[in-house]
Amino acid sequence: MEALVYTFLLVSTLGIIFFAIFFREPPKVPPTPTKRIK
C-alpha cells in the first residue's frame, strides 16, 4: 500500500514540475519551425 502512495507522490511531483516549467516559459521563443515540439 505504501508503494502506491509513493508512486502517486512521485508522479504528482513530476507532473507539477513539468506543468510549472511548461507554463513558466513565455511565448518569446525565436521564430523557429514548430517541428521541435516532441
Swiss-Prot record:
Stretches that traverse the bilayer: 3-23
> Could you tell me where this protein is found in the cell?
Plastid, Chloroplast thylakoid membrane
Q: What is its main location?
A: plastid
Record's InterPro entries? PSII_PsbT, PSII_PsbT_sf
Q: Which GO terms describe its biological process?
A: photosynthesis
Q: What's in the keyword line of the UniProt record?
A: Chloroplast, Membrane, Photosynthesis, Photosystem II, Plastid, Thylakoid, Transmembrane, Transmembrane helix
What Pfam families does this protein map onto? PsbT
Please indicate if the UniProt record lists Endoplasmic reticulum as a keyword. Answer: no
How does this chain sit within the bilayer?
Single-pass membrane protein
- SUPFAM superfamilies reported for this sequence: Photosystem II reaction center protein T, PsbT
Q: Does the keyword Transmembrane helix apply?
A: yes
- Which is one Gene Ontology cellular component term of this protein? chloroplast thylakoid membrane
Q: What does this protein do?
A: Found at the monomer-monomer interface of the photosystem II (PS II) dimer, plays a role in assembly and dimerization of PSII. PSII is a light-driven water plastoquinone oxidoreductase, using light energy to abstract electrons from H(2)O, generating a proton gradient subsequently used for ATP formation.
What family, per the record?
Belongs to the PsbT family.
* Subunit composition and interactions: PSII is composed of 1 copy each of membrane proteins PsbA, PsbB, PsbC, PsbD, PsbE, PsbF, PsbH, PsbI, PsbJ, PsbK, PsbL, PsbM, PsbT, PsbY, PsbZ, Psb30/Ycf12, at least 3 peripheral proteins of the oxygen-evolving complex and a large number of cofactors. It forms dimeric complexes.
HAMAP family tied to this protein:
PSII_PsbT (MF_00808)
- What name is this protein filed under? Photosystem II reaction center protein T
Where does this protein come from, organism-wise? Triticum aestivum
List the gene name: psbT
